[in-house]
Swiss-Prot record:
Tagged with keyword Zinc: no
GO biological process, any: translation
Gene symbol of the encoding locus: rpsC
Protein's UniProt name: Small ribosomal subunit protein uS3
Limits of the KH type-2 domain: 38-106
Organism: Moorella thermoacetica (strain ATCC 39073 / JCM 9320)
Gene3D superfamilies linked: 3.30.300.20, Ribosomal protein S3, C-terminal domain (3.30.1140.32)
Amino acid sequence: MGQKVHPKGLRLGIIRDWDSRWYAGKEYKTLLHEDLKIREFIKKRLYQAGIASVEIERAANRIKVIVNTAKPGIVIGRGGAEVEALRKDLERLTGKQVNLNIAEIKKPELNAQLVAENVAAQLEKRIAFRRAMKQAVGRAMRLGAQGIKIACGGRLAGAEIARTEWYSEGKVPLHTLRADIDYGFAEANTTYGKIGVKVWIYKGEVLPERARVREGGSK
């Protein structure tokens, strides 16, 4: 069932870590909604900054937020003014002390979420969906991806009947748990309705972080 399940969720605790790292008892529901609010607020405010993911860690009444972005300059601003304003707004939103860190994504062409958002943005600008998919696949493969698969679903090119079209190159082993597969989803709001964009990027195998026993029993 590797094709049906979310590729990141399937690999949690094996080669991937959670985006929200905290434990709560009775307050779990409240904190979960707070996480969703934080992510939605950052995504809306920094839409042009290429935000791939937002990681959240909690300790007592403090929140550590790590923003993974392709354009850290936009997030930080001149002299750090933008990031400081964002931190204060997050503190007002949550009522807690917020520590904000910015992490740069060196190769945005290999980040599935950013690729999906880029293809969706091109579809909104009326660029042909096949061309947008082909360009994204080509860029990812040139930068070292071992495989990539893109799916666009909806009223493609204004067709009366919705359909899904795929474009792929290389291999994407969805069943292999040690396979480092990144997954992203975005929606394009066109005049004909929404078009969903899904992206899978395979970057190679990740071996577990433990002492590997060689043949013959020696470590």
